[in-house]
UniProtKB/Swiss-Prot annotation:
Mg(2+) binds at residues 14, 50, 116. Its cofactor is Mg(2+). Homodimer. GO terms for molecular function: ATP binding; dethiobiotin synthase activity; magnesium ion binding. This is ATP-dependent dethiobiotin synthetase BioD. It catalyses: (7R,8S)-7,8-diammoniononanoate + CO2 + ATP = (4R,5S)-dethiobiotin + ADP + phosphate + 3 H(+).
Amino acid sequence: MLFISATNTNAGKTTCARLLAQYCNACGVKTILLKPIETGVNDAINHSSDAHLFLQDNRLLDRSLTLKDISFYRYHKVSAPLIAQQEEDPNAPIDTDNLTQRLHNFTKTYDLVIVEGAGGLCVPITLEENMLDFALKLKAKMLLISHDNLGLINDCLLNDFLLKSHQLDYKIAINLKGNNTAFHSISLPYIELFNTRSNNPIVIFQQSLKVLMSFALK
């Protein structure tokens, strides 16, 4: 199981998750995408949420899948899951134990289960648990996606520091957009220096699909 988080919201988790799953499936690795918790959605009028996009991809493998099969807590409010849950469904806190069981059931059918979190590692799910706690409970490997803008060095190093302090395998990958020419002169020089001293180098996502698939499966 691979848990995908990010340095922050809008870093490109969903895009990267879909690209990695498509690559894995093309390589013969049967891969499903799950979005157990999603906020800022209105399923009655908007069918382009992260989970809807995942469902579209997943149905290439199993036409019987529905949104409820891959996304279990869905809220209208654009906020951390804890805040949305307390406002919209205060008597039904998110049960990560139940989620863990449901997500692990997919490992019986699929070679690789990709779980996308909401926001970054410290986003609260309950008063006691955040996204990193959830990934640890799942015993999943972690793929952390970084944006490619100015400030990514600080964001990557902070997340690397946090992840190193926990017992889980992780990789950090930069979601490099094709039109970002500034990255190569502003941020890449430090990333290359960092990688010479680190036993867990930061990679560029688009250049590392094979590496990331191998990491997820090993």
